[in-house]
From Swiss-Prot:
Gene3D superfamilies in the record: Nascent polypeptide-associated complex domain (2.20.70.30)
Acidic residues compositional bias, start-end: 134-150
Identification of the protein by name: Transcription factor BTF3 homolog 4
Pfam families named among the record's database cross-references: NAC (PF01849)
Family to which the UniProt record says this protein belongs: Belongs to the NAC-beta family.
Top-rank lineage group of the source organism: Eukaryota
Region called Disordered, residue ranges: 125-158
Classification via SMART domains: NAC (SM01407)
Gene: btf3l4
Domain NAC-A/B, residue spans: 33-98
Membrane-spanning ranges: none
Length: 158
């Protein structure tokens, strides 16, 4: 670039005279509502339609976590092959949602679920297997039976 042009551009940026600080660049803070408005305007351009009656949306990741939307707003544009899901999202483990999510799982997820099921009993057995030291400690907490209470109740009945 030409040095003269560069000097002109620098002179335009100065606010005061020679030796003063240059103006600060204005920082524009974006808010979530501004992003949401921009997203909604982009979706309007795609001519999306609202899909009613959807109670929940689950997106299953490869690592076994699930992105769960409860009562989301779902919009679709079939011509653009675009679906927009908006609402409060929660990230959960697949095992937390197991009873209700089984009907939604595909073949890939079912194989990963089988692997989880094979690992789960091993973990439970490892955690619940009582050690000999633990058994002795549990016996100390329970008092020994000294008398026979059945005989006392039979004597009262006679």
């Amino acid at each position: 670039m030409n040095q003269e042009k560069l000097a002109k551009l620098q002179a335009q940026v100065r606010i005061g005279g020679k030796g003063t600080a240059r103006r600060k660049k204005k920082v524009v803070h974006r808010t979530a509502t501004a992003d949401d408005k921009k997203l909604q305007s982009s979706l309007k351009k795609l001519v999306v339609n609202n899909i009613a009656g959807i109670e929940e949306v689950n997106m299953i990741k490869d690592d076994g976590t699930v992105i769960h939307f409860n009562n989301p707003k779902v919009q679709a544009s079939l011509s653009a092959n675009t679906f927009a899901i908006t609402g409060h999202a929660e990230t959960k483990q697949l095992t937390e949602m197991l009873p209700g999510i089984l009907s939604q799982l595909g073949a890939d997820s079912l194989t990963s679920l089988r692997k989880l099921a094979e690992q789960f009993p091993r973990q439970v057995l490892d955690n619940k297997a009582p050690k000999a030291e633990d058994i002795d400690e549990e016996d100390d907490d329970v008092p020994d039976l000294v008398e026979n209470f059945d005989e006392a109740s039979k004597n009262e009945a006679n």
